[in-house]
Amino acid sequence: MNYLEFEVIWGVNNIYSILELKSKLIYEGIFKGKVLETGCKEYSPLVPGDIVLGYIYGSRKVYIDKRASRKNILWRYNRKADLRQTIVSNIDNILIVNSANFPEMKNFFIDRVLVVAEEQNIVPIIVINKIDKGISQRVEEFSEIYKNLGYKVLKTSVKTFEGIKEIKEVLRNSRTSFIGQSGVGKSSLINLIDSKASQSVNEISHKYSRGKHTTVYAISFYSESGIIVDTPGIKEFGIETLPFENLRYYFKEFENFASLCKYKSCLHVSEPCCSVISSLGNGISKLRYESYLKILSELKNYKNYAR
């Protein structure tokens, strides 16, 4: 059987739009059987960025038989299914898009995404969008905290074009996913970066103080700058299936202090002679530490619930 390689562009209800890698032609792909055998229970067996093997059986139609191994995944916890839900795969960068003012920038959301990025070896870039409407002192403080940790922080506006050139530099010759809560302006940024991207943009719903979901499914497309993956606006980004003992490794500022803790198994909560705790406010941000404790509590509660 003559297998061909395809890249998943997007899909819904187990019907996928896939790109044949050699011809660059788009096909409609479906599973040969009822499900795709991946060796584990998954909420999303195929997502944008996946490479699959299949064969053509009709006019622009393909039976998908296998999924190639993934370099990495951007995932979150799906509470309803009680599983990890993969959003995109095989990406180089993730742009975590936030609003400078409305909807309110939330460091807890950013920190959860950063944990997954660190776990999966994805380069995270924090974007503060809509700066033409002003930036609060609180947002500026968040920005400095992440900059001091070595994370790239870009300030952008689709009205003044500030930061757009820098985003295009990030995108160049790479695969980059945009993620953010509803209403932060992801689709507006993508439309400005690539005018051919037919992304709909809705006004923020003031009634609920959140944005309307304008991108319903994750979708990737090739732009002049690089490969872009847009994702739906996300209200919550849970990471409950991450083992709580591992969380400490993904707060990068702990690394230089953890080796000085009395106990190797130190979780930096209430243990005696904890170098991380003693460094709060002097090398360790109190805001980031509060975020760590909150996430750690969630992971512990999930483990107890799952027993």
Curated annotation (Swiss-Prot):
One Pfam family this sequence matches: RsgA_GTPase
CP-type G domain span: 80-237
A GO MF label: GTPase activity
Cofactor(s) demanded: Zn(2+)
Enzyme class: hydrolase
Keyword RNA-binding attached: yes
Domain of life of the native organism: Bacteria
GO biological process, one term: ribosomal small subunit biogenesis
Co-factor remark: Binds 1 zinc ion per subunit.
InterPro entries: G_CP_dom (IPR030378), P-loop_NTPase (IPR027417), Ribosome_biogen_GTPase_RsgA (IPR004881), RsgA_GTPase_dom (IPR010914)
Key words of the record: Cytoplasm, GTP-binding, Hydrolase, Metal-binding, Nucleotide-binding, Ribosome biogenesis, RNA-binding, rRNA-binding, Zinc
GO cellular component terms given for this protein: cytoplasm
Family designation: Belongs to the TRAFAC class YlqF/YawG GTPase family. RsgA subfamily.
Function: One of several proteins that assist in the late maturation steps of the functional core of the 30S ribosomal subunit. Helps release RbfA from mature subunits. May play a role in the assembly of ribosomal proteins into the subunit. Circularly permuted GTPase that catalyzes slow GTP hydrolysis, GTPase activity is stimulated by the 30S ribosomal subunit.
Name of the protein: Small ribosomal subunit biogenesis GTPase RsgA
